Regions:
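N-terminal subdomain of nucleotide-sugar transferases
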Residues: 1-47
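A conserved mid-protein helix/loop that constitutes part of the nucleotide-sugar donor-binding site
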Residues: 20, 206-224
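A short, charged, and often flexible helix/loop element on the N-terminal side
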Residues: 46, 50-85, 129-130
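A short beta-strand/loop micro-motif in the catalytic core of glycosyltransferases
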Residues: 91-92, 147-157, 176
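Short His-centered aromatic/hydrophobic patch
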Residues: 93-98, 117
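Nucleotide-sugar donor phosphate/pyrophosphate-binding loop at the beta->alpha transition
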Residues: 111-114, 122-144, 161
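Carbohydrate-associated surface elements
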Residues: 158, 181
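A short helix/loop element that forms part of the nucleotide-sugar donor recognition site in Leloir-type
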Residues: 188-201, 207
């Protein structure tokens, strides 16, 4: 089965959790014999790995939109990605940046569109500061794509609740929880109290640890 994964981020251009998620997802899909996983990502051409030639495509902003609002530049890339998905059997988009590419591909090729919900535009109103009027466009893109998607994957039960609260038109049966996983071949617990003490942490006392970008959306202020 050919699956096309659509994302703004993909190594080496990764700046957030969604990019890490997509990279690990694609690695797992490409390890399967029954899946041919293609990647369509924003940005400069990526180096190809042996045995994966022709499976990863990159898309730069359209030159004609170089001075346009960022949301319009995103839609320009989405159009190019949708054209590049010819031959797909299923498209899987991540974040609003790639959602419209997935939505258009589903319409154009009559294939299922699966969306992974990493964050939601209605819950990030401060993005209007970054995108200006483009925030209305990004919100429209997300709503349109989610409401038409064959399935929505939420990374937690709380995210599923947020999806249904933000977009009540979506059938709850189409929203599924798939938690972010950890590859235990690469990550496993290491018990080393001496090393922990070297880092200035007392292993005999409870610790509260935050791992993530220090941005408003992460809710660090609530933890503090």
């Amino acid at each position: 089965m050919r699956v096309d994964v659509l994302s703004r981020e993909y190594p080496p251009e990764v700046y957030g959790g969604a990019g890490v998620h997509v990279a690990e997802l694609v690695r797992a899909l490409r390890a399967r014999d029954d899946v041919e996983a293609h990647v369509h990502a924003f940005g400069a051409p990526r180096p190809e790995q042996p045995g994966e030639e022709g499976l990863t495509s990159s898309y730069a902003d359209l030159a004609e939109l170089s001075g346009a609002n960022a949301a319009l530049r995103t839609l320009g890339v989405d159009l190019a990605i949708a054209a590049g998905c010819a031959g797909t059997e299923l498209v899987h988009s991540h974040t609003w940046y790639a959602n419209m590419a997935g939505h258009l591909s589903a319409l154009l090729y009559d294939v299922p569109h699966v969306v992974s919900a990493h964050s939601l535009e209605p819950l990030r109103p401060w993005k209007a500061e970054q995108l200006g009027g483009g925030y209305a466009i990004s919100s429209w893109v997300e709503r349109t794509s989610y409401e038409a998607a064959a399935a929505v994957i939420a990374v937690s039960a709380a995210m599923r609740d947020d999806v249904l609260a933000s977009y009540p038109a979506i059938d709850p049966a189409r929203v599924h929880v798939v938690h972010n996983g950890i590859d235990t071949a690469d990550w496993s617990p290491r018990v080393d109290p001496a090393r922990v003490r070297e880092l200035g942490v007392d292993p005999d006392r409870p610790s509260v640890v935050f791992v993530g970008r220090i941005t408003r959306q992460k809710g660090l202020i609530h933890l503090v």
